[in-house]
A protein has these predicted regions:
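C-terminal structural segment of proteins
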Residues: 1-333
Length: 333
């Protein structure tokens, strides 16, 4: 077993300083990190425990009417918080669709943002071809088992998908990630937080070395009355999405004022279906228009030999999610 040192950070500045040491990583709930360590995928030499930093485990209202969710808020607490349930039911649904109750009780919002892919070739170090684990080694999934892999935004270097349900909802809601690092504090628009693989699939996010996620900000609630998170998976119990859809609408009678649609399980990052949104904005919500919008969302899909079904599955999921969102009257069941 590798030797690992441990340090408990007392504040954000101390955590950032400690993270400058080679091989240091932050640990909150640790639900994903421990899996990676046990499998030999992650080999940190120093763990920086951030769970005792005050002020990162609260949900607060912002002056503009939005909310701030601290990075250390547990997934279960975020999902069941009154402000989230009432004003951002889409996020509550997505959080409750992820993992198991036990994992949600331990996992943090900040850690959820940093989940690594669940690609089997990434997790099994017996497979030496994995550009995400070892850049330049190849991608075993391209010619292997790729039923669960990406159909949008992939590259010849990597076809893995992002596994986070929460992140799909945050993408649709135009969240902002707050971070603190050696150069100070900054914010990252959610659309810019996760990366497509390109030629560096080992880099999942746009975080700079040593930066710590401190919170996620949500804009004022515009979609509390009409939103829905739909997750399609192989079994009803704990499973990652084959396809998921976060749909959020502002409705004026039968007309869509504003549509926000994000997809999960189809790309290296939560995928905003901008083409579908544009086709729905300002239009009456007819089924013909909705089906055309769903087709537009997948027009650039490039499926692999085992996951061609995902294209039609995603289109149908968009139709279902948007129809459900349009009929919804707010809140979480």
């Amino acid at each position: 077993m590798d030797a690992i040192s441990y340090e408990r950070a007392g504040d954000v500045a101390g955590a950032v300083r400690a993270a400058q040491q080679p091989g240091a990583v932050f640990i909150g709930g640790g639900t994903n990190l421990l899996d990676l360590m046990k499998g030999g995928v992650a080999r940190p030499v120093r763990l920086i425990d951030i769970t005792h930093i005050n002020g990162l485990d609260t949900v607060t209202t912002l002056p503009d009417g939005g909310i701030r969710i601290g990075a250390l808020v547990r997934n279960s607490d975020a999902a069941n918080h009154a402000l989230v349930r009432e004003q951002y039911p889409l996020l509550s649904q997505a959080l409750l669709a992820g993992a198991s109750a036990q994992l949600r009780n331990m996992a943090t919002v900040g850690g959820n943002l940093l989940q690594r892919t669940r690609c089997g070739y990434f997790y099994d170090t017996a497979f030496t071809q994995c550009n995400k684990r070892t850049p330049g080694s190849g991608c075993a999934a391209l010619d292997g088992r790729n039923r669960t892999h990406a159909i949008l935004g992939a590259s010849p270097q990597c076809i893995a998908v992002n596994p986070s349900d929460m992140s799909v909802a945050l993408a649709a809601l135009d969240a902002v990630v707050r971070v603190s690092g050696p150069a100070g504090e900054r914010t990252i628009a959610f659309a810019d937080f996760h990366r497509l693989p390109a030629d560096r699939p080992d880099v999942d996010t746009t975080l700079r070395p040593g930066e710590l996620i401190t919170a996620v900000d949500l804009p004022p609630p515009l979609f509390s009355a009409h939103s829905h998170y739909l997750k399609v998976r192989d079994r009803a119990s704990y499973a990652f999405a084959l396809v998921s859809v976060a749909a959020a609408l502002q409705m004026d009678g039968e007309r869509v004022q504003t549509a926000r649609i994000a997809l999960g399980g189809v790309a290296h990052k939560p995928w905003r279906a901008s083409a579908a949104e544009q086709m729905l904005n300002g239009q009456p919500l007819s089924q013909a228009t909705l089906k055309n919008a769903a087709a537009a969302a997948l027009s650039d899909a490039r499926p692999q030999h085992e996951n061609r079904f995902k294209v039609q599955l995603a289109q149908r999921a968009i139709v279902r999610a948007v129809n459900h969102a349009a009929a919804r009257d707010g809140g979480v069941a």
